[in-house]
Design a protein with these regions (language model features):
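Amphipathic alpha-helical dimer-interface segment in Rossmann-like NAD(P)H-dependent oxidoreductases
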Residues: 1-9, 45
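Residue(s) in the substrate-gating loop at a strand-loop-helix junction
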Residues: 16
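Active-site helix of classical SDR
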Residues: 32
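Short-chain dehydrogenase/reductase
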Residues: 92, 119-129
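Active-site loop immediately N-terminal to the catalytic Tyr-X3-Lys motif
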Residues: 21-27
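SDR active-site lid
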Residues: 49-117
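Active-site-adjacent segment of SDR/Rossmann-fold oxidoreductases
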Residues: 21, 42-53
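Non-catalytic terminal and boundary segments that flank Rossmann-like NAD(P)-dependent oxidoreductase
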Residues: 92, 139-163
């Protein structure tokens, strides 16, 4: 942190679409990305007082070797075969992948920015997905507002709590 502070620097954290929501067959992957983003949000709040910016980069699909040579898998379980087939079809039919150099150009623009955002989505598909997930969450929260608010009551803290 002191080295970053003296330069009024920034930290760029790679994340992924997996941090936007939990998707079938990606639970452990998504959990790691949720953790990375929570840690990065906390770091951003801590580092802001020192003039240090933190950005979480959330890329969509890019033509890399991730899904061919870059991924280790285990023997599929028969019970998951229909779900796996459905997901493979979705990826084949609707996957929007792009050239990695376009992501690199966006990250360079980010690095050169005087006011980088906490989060940067890379790609149209992930941009749309992020908004869809956010709208769904907002609608759910709004639908359960009364129940949510009823679960809290202003009262004095029990003995032993607080200062």
């Amino acid at each position: 942190m002191p080295a970053l502070e003296s330069d009024r620097s920034a930290s760029t954290r790679p994340s992924s679409i997996g941090a936007l929501g939990g998707f079938p067959l990606t639970g452990m992957y998504s959990a790691s990305k949720f953790a990375l983003e929570g840690m990065s949000e906390a770091l951003a709040a801590e580092a802001a007082r020192f003039g240090i910016k933190v950005t979480i980069v959330e890329p969509g699909g890019y033509w890399t070797g991730l899904y061919t040579t870059g991924m280790a898998t285990t023997e599929p379980m028969d019970a998951y075969a229909p779900l796996r087939a459905e997901l493979e079809k979705q990826f084949a039919d609707g996957s929007v992948d792009s050239m990695p150099h376009l992501a690199a150009e966006a990250v360079m623009k980010l690095v050169d920015s005087d006011d980088p955002p906490l989060r940067l989505l890379l790609g149209s598909a992930i941009y749309d997905l992020a908004f869809d997930i956010s709208r769904q969450r907002m609608a759910t929260w709004a639908g359960w507002e009364e129940t949510s608010r009823a679960a809290e009551q202003a009262t004095e803290a029990p003995e032993g709590y607080g200062a």
